[in-house]
Amino acid sequence: MTIRSPEPEVKIVVEKDPVKTSFEKWAKPGHFSRTLAKGPSTTTWIWNLHADAHDFDSHTNDLEEISRKVFSAHFGQLAIIFIWLSGMYFHGARFSNYEAWLSDPTHIKPSAQVVWPIVGQEILNGDVGGGFQGIQITSGFFQLWRASGITSELQLYSTAIGGLVFAALMLFAGWFHYHKAAPKLAWFQDVESMLNHHLAGLLGLGSLSWAGHQVHVSLPINQLLDAGVDPKEIPLPHEFILNRDLLAELYPSFAKGLTPFFTLNWSEYSDFLTFRGGLNPVTGGLWLTDTAHHHLAIAVLFLVAGHMYRTNWGIGHSFKEILEAHKGPFTGEGHKGLYEILTTSWHAQLALNLAMLGSLTIIVAHHMYAMPPYPYLATDYGTQLSLFTHHMWIGGFLIVGAAAHAAIFMVRDYDPTTQYNNLLDRVLRHRDAIISHLNWVCIFLGFHSFGLYIHNDTMSALGRPQDMFSDTAIQLQPVFAQWIQNTHALAPNFTAPNALASTSLTWGGGDVIAVGSKVALLPIPLGTADFLVHHIHAFTIHVTVLILLKGVLFARSSRLIPDKANLGFRFPCDGPGRGGTCQVSAWDHVFLGLFWMYNSISVVIFHFSWKMQSDVWGTISEQGVVTHITGGNFAQSAITINGWLRDFLWAQASQVIQSYGSSLSAYGLLFLGAHFVWAFSLMFLFSGRGYWQELIESIVWAHNKLKVAPAIQPRALSITQGRAVGVAHYLLGGIATTWAFFLARIIAVG
C-alpha cells in the first residue's frame, strides 16, 4: 500500500448529449450494419439480424461506444427484472391465497395463478386448501414474503407498484446515460472506484439495509406469527419502525437503544442477533435472528472491503500493483498484463464473472435444502425440488457462458505481443499437456464409473446379488464424505463450542425436524449408491470442462488450423479444399459443451430428487416413526442402470403420464409436447444443409409454376444456424420434460 499526493483537479467523466434521441433507427432493422441495413434479399437476413443485433463488437471498434451500449443495456435488463418482479408481487396481491396460507402454512398449499375458463382448462385450478382453487406454485415466493414480514395482500400490491416505479426509473437511466450524459471510457476503466462503490455500496449498504429491515420489521412480525398471532392483529411495519416500545416487548435490549453499541457491550443485542445454528422447530427454516446476524456481519465485511482501494485520496491498494506483484518462483511474470486485459476486454471480465456467479449459483442450490432459509420452505417439497433444479440449471448455463466469452476474448481481444511469460501465456503454451491429461482423466472416470454400474447390472441379471457393489454385499462407502459429515455433526460440542447446533441437520447427529407431521430435514446417510453416482458426476463435469477448456485454449490456433484467429469466433469450416476442418470453431465447442452441461445437470437433479424422496422427505407419526415417500429404496435401486430406469424414471413418471383429467393435466401435456420439441431438435442436428437446400429449391419451383414465388429468396439455414436452432430445442425440450416430470410427481405425492 502506498501513499501519494492526491490529484487536485476534478476529472470530468461524462460527455453531454453524445447521441441524439431518434426513433428513425427503430424503423430500420439492421441499422447497425451496412449489409443488413439494405434489407432482406434472402431469408438468411433475419437470422443474421438476430445473431448480430446485440454483438456490439461488430457494430463498432470504439471501446467507449461499446461500453456505453453495454452499460445502457444493463439498465434495460434491470427494468425487465423489476417488471417481472412486480408481476410476481401483483399475482400475489390479486390472484393468490397468500393470506390464507399465512394462517395455516402446513395444510394450505401456495397458489398465485387462477386459470380462466375458456375451453375447459379451469380443470387446472386444483383445490389447494382454505377454500381456494388455483394452480399450486413452487417458486418459494410465499415463504420469502413471510420471512420479509409481509402480512397482507395490500402490502404485496404496494410493493408491486413500487416495482413498476423502479422499472420506469431504470428505463429512464438507460436512456439518460446513453443519450444525455454518457460516461467516458476512463470511467468504465476506473476499477478502484468501481470496486469501492460495488463492495461498499451494493453489497455493504445492500446487506446493511436488508439486515435493518430484518431486525426492525421481519423479526418481530415473524416472532408473532410463529407464536400463532393472527396476521390481522400484528402491528404494521411502520409501527414497529416508529415505536421502539413495541419492539422492546419482543426484544428487551431495544429499550437500551444504542448505548450497548457505543459502549462495546454488543452481547446485549444477542436477543435478536443470535448464533444458534440448526432450524426453528416451528417453521423448519433457519432462525431468522441468525440470518439477521449474518447479514449484519456480511455488511460490516463489505463496508470495510469497500474502503481498500486507492482513489482520489492517495491511500489504499492499486489493483495493477497487486496483480503485478503476484508472482511465485515457478510462475514467470505471474499476473502481469492481466490488468490491461481486464480493463480493455469486457469479454474477459464477463467470463470471470460468469464462472464465479455460475459456481456460486450451484452452491446456492445446495444450501437451499441443507440450510432452508425461509419459514415453511423445507416442508414444501415441490418448492424445494424446483429451487434446487432451477439453481442447478442456471449455474450450468452461466458456466458454459463463461467459456463462451473467454473464447470470444481469445479471438477478438487477446494480443499475444503484450502477453509474454505471464500465467495466461504459460497456460496457452502447455495447453497440449493440459488437454491430453484432462482427456485421460475423462476416459478413466467414464470407464470406471460406468463400469461399476455395468458390473452391477450384469451381476443382478445373473442373479448374483452377493457379488454386487452395494451396502449389503461388496461395500464402496464414501468414507471421505462421511468423515466430513461427522466432523461437522460433532462440531457444536468440540470445535465450535459456542454454536448450539451444527450448521445443517444433513451432517448427522440424529435430530429430525418435523413441521406439521412432515419431515423438514434429517441427517442424510451416504452409501455405496451415492459413491457410484458421485463418480458419474465427476465424469460428466470433467467432460464438460474438457470440451469448454479445449474451445478456449485452441480458440486462436491449433495444429490443424494455425490461423484460426483470423476465421473468427464462429465459422463452419476452414474454407473449401480443407476437409476435416468443420466444427472446430470456438462457437462449436460451446455448442458441444451445452450438451454435456445438460448431461451433468440432469444426473445431479435426478440424484437429488430420488435421494430426497427416498431418504429425507416423508411423514412422521406421533410415535416418531418416519415413512419416506419412496421408502428408502435409493440405496438398493440406484446401484444399477436398470434400477434408475425402472424405479426412478418409470416408477415416478406414472403421475405425469396419468395426469390427464386432473388438475395436473397441464404437466401431462407439457411432458408430451416437450418430448416433441426435443425430437424436433434432432431434425436440425442430424441433417445436412444440402438436403434442405435441395428440398427448398424444389418447393420454390412449384411456387414459380403457380406464380406465387416470394420476393425474398428462401435459403436453408447455415450449418451454424442449424446447430444453434438444434441445441436450443434440445435444451428447451429436455428441460421442459424434466420440469413436467418432477412437478407432476412431487405435487401428487409431496
UniProtKB/Swiss-Prot annotation:
Mostly located where? plastid
Q: Which PANTHER family does the entry link to?
A: OUTER MEMBRANE PROTEIN, OMPA-RELATED (PTHR30128), PHOTOSYSTEM I P700 CHLOROPHYLL A APOPROTEIN A1-RELATED (PTHR30128:SF19)
In this chain, [4Fe-4S] cluster is annotated as bound at C573, C582
Purpose? PsaA and PsaB bind P700, the primary electron donor of photosystem I (PSI), as well as the electron acceptors A0, A1 and FX. PSI is a plastocyanin-ferredoxin oxidoreductase, converting photonic excitation into a charge separation, which transfers an electron from the donor P700 chlorophyll pair to the spectroscopically characterized acceptors A0, A1, FX, FA and FB in turn. Oxidized P700 is reduced on the lumenal side of the thylakoid membrane by plastocyanin.
Q: Where in the cell is it found?
A: Plastid, Chloroplast thylakoid membrane
| GO biological process per UniProt | photosynthesis
- State the organism of origin: Marchantia polymorpha
Q: How is the cofactor bound?
A: P700 is a chlorophyll a/chlorophyll a' dimer, A0 is one or more chlorophyll a, A1 is one or both phylloquinones and FX is a shared 4Fe-4S iron-sulfur center.
Q: What subunit structure does UniProt give?
A: The PsaA/B heterodimer binds the P700 chlorophyll special pair and subsequent electron acceptors. PSI consists of a core antenna complex that captures photons, and an electron transfer chain that converts photonic excitation into a charge separation. The eukaryotic PSI reaction center is composed of at least 11 subunits.
Coiled-coil regions, chain positions: none
UniProt cross-references to HAMAP family, sorted A to Z: PSI_PsaA (MF_00458)
Q: Which family does it belong to?
A: Belongs to the PsaA/PsaB family.
Q: Which SUPFAM superfamilies match?
A: Photosystem I subunits PsaA/PsaB (SSF81558)
Residues that bind chlorophyll a', according to the entry?
H675
Carries keyword tRNA processing?
no
Q: Which UniProt keywords apply?
A: 4Fe-4S, Chlorophyll, Chloroplast, Chromophore, Electron transport, Iron, Iron-sulfur, Magnesium, Membrane, Metal-binding, Oxidoreductase, Photosynthesis, Photosystem I, Plastid, Thylakoid, Transmembrane, Transmembrane helix, Transport
Q: Name one GO molecular function term.
A: magnesium ion binding
The record lists chlorophyll a as bound by M683, Y691
Report the domain of life of the source organism: Eukaryota
Which EC number applies?
1.97.1.12
Which segments cross the bilayer?
70-93, 156-179, 195-219, 291-309, 346-369, 385-411, 433-455, 531-549, 589-610, 664-686, 724-744
**What's its catalytic activity?**
reduced [plastocyanin] + hnu + oxidized [2Fe-2S]-[ferredoxin] = oxidized [plastocyanin] + reduced [2Fe-2S]-[ferredoxin]
Q: Where does phylloquinone bind?
A: W692
Under what name is this protein listed? Answer: Photosystem I P700 chlorophyll a apoprotein A1
Q: Name one GO cellular component term.
A: photosystem I
